[in-house]
């Protein structure tokens, strides 16, 4: 039975970032996604608009190769374009001049920061990108030290058009005592909107969607697990618009 999971953050397109290194590795990652019950998969290669040129032609060609492979294998796996944007001071200018790569040509962008980013810089990034008309899915929010400040993430969500993504690896292994408490609080209070694999390979950073789903279901209930994997709720509605 297919679980019908959404994986909105993955680095399977080979030859463009620190994800898949070869076509063979990309195919192995697609095999793993299908085996994990993923049916909607986003190709969110790293990009830093304003800082460096993104290899768009290579990305598009290799993404199409991935689609060909999925069709040949008969996978119920739809692949969509996207990017994981690194916030930097030039990002707003890049957005104004040429636009930003979005998730499946919607108004949503997946954006990350450096782990040590300050609360001020994090909010500046949200303000700038939202001010250009984008909705922002903040990648792996558990990484940012400034969000250890209790209640800050909730305030930012109330102020800006953002959603929060957490990695499956964090669901499965939250870390130390205080990190674990924060992760559990966010999940329990509904601060996290969606989980994703952030997969880069099939070894050290694999998919693990099914395993994370089962843990969420055991710890927080099926309704929460379904919402966080795009089987129900806002991200299922998002999928239905694509």
PLM region descriptions:
Residues 46, 191-207:
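Short acidic/histidine-rich active-site segments
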Residues 52-165:
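Extended substrate/RNA-proximal surfaces in nucleic-acid metabolism proteins
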Residues 209-242:
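Mid-to-C-terminal alpha-helical segments outside catalytic/metal-binding sites
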């Amino acid at each position: 039975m297919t679980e019908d999971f959404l994986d909105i953050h993955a680095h399977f397109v080979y030859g463009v970032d620190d994800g898949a290194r070869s076509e063979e590795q990309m195919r192995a990652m697609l095999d793993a996604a299908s085996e994990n019950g993923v049916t909607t998969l986003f190709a969110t290669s790293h990009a830093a608009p304003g800082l460096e040129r993104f290899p768009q032609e290579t990305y598009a060609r290799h993404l199409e190769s991935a689609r060909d492979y999925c069709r040949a294998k008969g996978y119920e796996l739809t692949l969509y374009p996207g990017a994981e944007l690194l916030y930097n001071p030039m990002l707003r200018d890049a957005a104004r001049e040429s636009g930003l790569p979005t998730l499946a040509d919607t108004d949503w962008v997946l954006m990350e920061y450096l782990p040590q980013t300050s609360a001020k810089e994090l909010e500046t990034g949200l303000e700038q990108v939202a001010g250009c008309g984008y909705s922002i899915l903040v990648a792996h929010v558990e990484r940012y030290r400034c969000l250890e400040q209790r209640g800050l993430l909730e305030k930012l969500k109330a102020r800006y058009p953002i959603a929060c993504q957490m990695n499956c690896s964090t669901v499965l292994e939250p870390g130390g005592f205080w990190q674990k408490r924060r992760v559990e609080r966010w999940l329990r209070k509904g601060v996290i909107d969606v989980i994703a694999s952030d997969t880069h390979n099939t070894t050290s950073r694999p998919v693990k969607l099914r395993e994370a789903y089962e843990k969420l279901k055991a710890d927080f209930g099926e309704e929460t697990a379904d919402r966080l994997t795009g089987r129900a709720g806002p991200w299922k509605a998002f999928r239905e618009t694509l």
